[in-house]
Regions:
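Beta-propeller folds
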Residues: 2-317, 418, 422, 603, ...
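Structured, non-catalytic alpha/beta "coupling" segments that mediate domain-domain communication
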Residues: 107-108, 113-123, 330-361, 517
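Cap/lid segment of the alpha/beta-hydrolase catalytic domain
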Residues: 146-150, 155, 362-485, 489, ...
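Generic beta-strand/beta-sheet core signal
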Residues: 183, 212, 259, 271, ...
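Flexible loop/turn segments at secondary-structure boundaries
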Residues: 218, 242, 264-266, 277, ...
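A structural signal for short secondary-structure junctions
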Residues: 295, 308-309, 327-331, 342-343, ...
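Active-site-proximal cap/loop segments of hydrolase catalytic domains
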Residues: 440-653
Length: 653
């Protein structure tokens, strides 16, 4: 879909649903309801780093400043890019064609709220009265182009109960800066107030807006602003640094919930929207390992919790992700949702709760599954646990052992590996690629226990799982090491980077997006904004020496050593606060030294081994993901150029 439509879909989802952390591709998990992923960071380092001389051979080492090292990496990347300009342009043109072909699958979403319908048109948020919706009588409520905010994107929208105000959350595409803009709706909408650093917000009454403030990537305070009296007041403060606070209004608008969540535990407080000035009331005190969410209807609280045994629901064989469509009319008896897979564009369904009837609403020329096979496998890990794998390949492919294979892994925070639809996946399938998704421990595919068995002192389980998955794929004839590439992002970089050190012979190349590669130094620095919050995932090496040694045993940065490495391509934003550039420069610096040391010490039998490419692509700005559709397209084109080149593949199709 077009960028503006894509953002509007997410915005309106947030309008009526839980606050979804801004990720590249959100999906609804079917087993455990854990907190949306909060990204992480690596440790800054001193303004000097040891790097090798830029000459061809191994030279004496010298000190480089941070700026010198960054300049050196930018020069190296520019040289790589200039060598493959034609390849990159061909791939970009093909990508654009695929994006345009599948962007029209999801039309502009129209949401009914009370007597109005709200929708996006030409980058503006608009509304019409229900009786005038077909007559073209449209009010433009909000247009970012009229505001002095450069490179800001709309993240969230809330409409006041009487439709007199609209609160719009915006976030910079190049940093963590955010704000809430409150517009008074009249014949000529007027900006009533701008509140900086706002993360989440909800209307309790026609005039009272509750909101959270984000400081150093953390939300721990809740305020309200009374537009009738023009005053604000602090309502709630979370004292525990492991917890992140957001707001949600129940679908019947009776209660506003203050949700304080850590990686494994939650606590919910209620504010009665009929009496918004009364103190919040706790639902249930936090219990370690229990996450819960509260809804309300007809004087009953409905609590969705992870306490107890999970329940699984079967989907069609091809489906890999499920996303609920927002529906403000909570009394509706019809539920709308989307099913998709990495190679199947989203298909819209309607389910009647009264008639127990499922209707497919999306028209398809021909199901993708006809030309693409999905295979479900299980690999036996080191401790004999069976690990699921999902593989996609072209239906008529032969000699699969000689086809390129791109393996995806994540394995952290109880979050599933991303299996949402991406147009570039279809292009890869057309070119004969196979796509494999490894559902390793540490993720959430098989529930909370699956996550717990792959975090803190069990992180090695996820690494062993990944190794077992790759070995099984090769054993069954799905490609071979010389045609295998590994891809991950953010915290998934821990497992990918660990395998890169422990079993480099299993892959030919690796592509990482804003990866977390220095776990130990990050978790040893309590002054970084998210270190305390991350302790439930990685442990606390500050007070536990055994934890420190355990992290050191798998940390990608700590375990770089002279050996034959696969080629690697890393993308990072220059001002990314969650994964600072300085940490990745240090990683690249150490990796280059290990590669050079190994080249110098190679035996006669090893002289024929090709030197790996080590490339760092530093993007401007501070976004943890690509800041725009064009940026994303360019990044994917360059990353695919790297993969096609490293695996010796032709880009001319």
């Amino acid at each position: 879909m077009h960028l503006s439509t894509k953002y509007f879909l997410q915005i309106m989802k947030d309008t009526v649903g839980h606050c979804i952390d801004s990720k590249c591709s959100p999906t609804l998990r079917l087993y455990s309801q854990t907190k949306s992923q909060i990204f992480f960071h690596t440790k800054n380092f001193r303004n000097a780093c040891i790097v090798p001389s830029s000459q061809g051979g191994v030279q004496p080492w010298r000190q480089f400043s941070y700026k010198d090292l960054l300049k050196s990496e930018q020069k190296h990347f520019s040289a790589f890019k200039s060598n493959y300009t034609e390849k990159t342009e061909r791939l970009k043109q093909r990508l654009e064609a695929h994006y345009e072909k599948y962007s029209s699958n999801l039309g502009s979403l129209v949401i009914k709220i009370g007597e109005y319908v709200y929708f996006e048109e030409n980058g503006c948020i608009c509304r019409s009265r229900l009786e005038e919706a077909d007559e073209g009588n449209i009010e433009v409520l909000f247009n970012m182009e009229d505001l002095p905010f450069c490179d800001f994107l709309i993240q969230r929208i809330r409409i006041s109960p009487d439709h007199r105000y609209i609160a719009v959350g915006i976030k910079s595409a190049n940093s963590e800066d955010s704000a809430s803009i409150i517009v008074k709706l009249s014949t000529q909408p007027v900006i009533e107030r701008i509140i900086p650093n706002v993360f989440s917000f909800e209307w309790a009454t026609n005039d009272i807006l509750f909101y959270t403030i984000q400081k150093n990537l953390r939300c721990h305070e809740v305020y309200f602003y009374d537009f009738s009296k023009k005053l604000s007041e602090l309502v709630y403060t979370e004292q525990d640094a492991r917890y992140f606070v957001d707001l949600y209004c129940t679908k019947d608008k009776r209660f506003l919930t203050i949700n304080s969540n850590s990686k494994t535990t939650s606590e919910v407080w209620l504010i009665d929207c009929h009496h918004p000035f009364k103190p919040p009331v706790i639902v249930q005190q936090r219990t370690k390992g229990v996450i819960y969410h509260v809804e309300h209807r007809n004087n009953y609280l409905y609590i969705l919790t992870t306490d107890g045994d999970p329940m699984g629901y079967k989907l069609p064989a091809w489906a890999c992700s499920l996303e609920l469509e927002p529906h403000p009319e909570y009394t509706s008896s019809t539920c709308y949702f989307w099913l998709a897979s990495p190679v199947q564009p989203p298909i819209r369904f309607a389910y009647s709760l009264v008639e127990n009837k499922l209707i497919e609403l999306t028209e398809q020329e021909m199901p993708i599954a006809v030309n693409c096979h999905a295979v479900r496998l299980e690999a036996k890990s080191k401790d004999e646990i069976w690990v699921p794998i999902t593989v996609f390949h072209k239906a008529n492919s032969v000699e699969l052992h000689r086809k390129p294979l791109l393996i995806h892994v994540y394995g952290a925070y109880g979050t599933d590996v991303n299996m949402s639809f991406k147009p570039e996946n279809l292009m890869l399938i057309e070119d004969g690629w196979m796509l494999a998704y490894c559902h390793v421990r540490g993720g959430g595919e098989l529930g909370l226990a699956w996550h717990k068995d792959g975090c803190t002192t069990k992180k090695h389980n996820g690494i062993h799982d990944l190794k077992a998955c790759i070995n099984l794929l090769h054993k069954l004839g799905f490609s071979c090491p010389m045609y295998t590439a590994l891809a991950s992002l953010s915290a998934g970089g821990v497992l990918a980077g660990a395998l890169y050190n422990s079993d480099p012979h299993l892959i030919r190349a690796m592509v990482l997006q804003s990866p977390f590669l220095d776990v130990l130094n990050t978790m040893l620095d309590p002054h970084l904004p998210l270190t305390i919050e991350e302790q439930e995932e990685w442990g606390n090496p500050l007070v536990d020496e055994n934890c420190k040694e355990y992290i050191k045993s798998y940390c990608p940065y700590q375990n770089i050593r002279p050996q034959h490495y696969p080629s690697v391509f890393i993308t990072v934003s220059e001002n990314d606060q969650r994964v600072p550039l300085a940490g990745l420069l240090r990683y690249i610096c150490k990796l280059r030294k290990a590669v050079r040391d190994y080249a110098e010490a190679k035996t006669t039998d090893e002289k024929g081994l090709q030197m790996p490419s080590v490339i760092l692509d530093v993007q401007p700005g501070g976004s943890h993901c690509a800041s725009s559709w064009e940026d994303s397209l360019n990044q994917v084109a360059v990353q695919l150029t790297f993969l096609y080149n490293e695996l010796g593949l032709d880009t001319q199709k």
